[in-house]
Amino acid sequence: PAAPGVPQTFADNAIVLDYGTQEALDVIRNRADEIAAVLIEPVQSANPFLQPKEFLQEIRRITKECKIAMIMDEVITGFRAAPGGAQEWF
C-alpha cells in the first residue's frame, strides 16, 4: 500500500494504470469483466496541468458501455473547476 491505513487486500485487488494512455484504456476494455470500478483523479494533484479531456471522456464511454462504476476523486478539485466539479467540466 502507498499510504498508512490502506489495507493490503485493497492494493492486491487494484490495477494501477498510467494516466492518460491508450494502454490504460485497452486494459479497462480487455479486463472489464474483472473491474468493479475505475477510480480516477480528473485533475491530478501531482500534475495539475495534465488534463486529458478526451481520455476521461473515453473512460466514461467504456465504463458506461461495460457497466463499470466510474468514480472521480475530486478531493483536490471539488467545486473549484466548476459548480458540478471537474466531472461537469470534462
Question: What are these model-predicted stretches?
Answer:
Residues 20, 29, 37-40, 56-66:
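Metal-dependent enolase-superfamily TIM-barrel catalytic cores that perform enediolate-based chemistry
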Residues 22, 46, 83:
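Surface-exposed, flexible loop/turn segments at secondary-structure boundaries
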Residues 32-49:
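Short acidic, glycine-rich surface-loop motifs adjacent to enzyme active sites
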Residues 17, 40, 72-73:
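Active-site flanking residues adjacent to catalytic metal/cofactor-binding acidic residues
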Residues 49-83:
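Catalytic PLP-binding core of fold-type I/II PLP enzymes
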Residues 1-37:
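PLP-dependent aspartate aminotransferase-fold enzymes
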Residues 87-90:
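Conserved active-site segment immediately N-terminal to the catalytic lysine
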Residues 21, 44, 76-77:
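Short, glycine/acidic-enriched loop or turn micro-motifs at the edges of active sites
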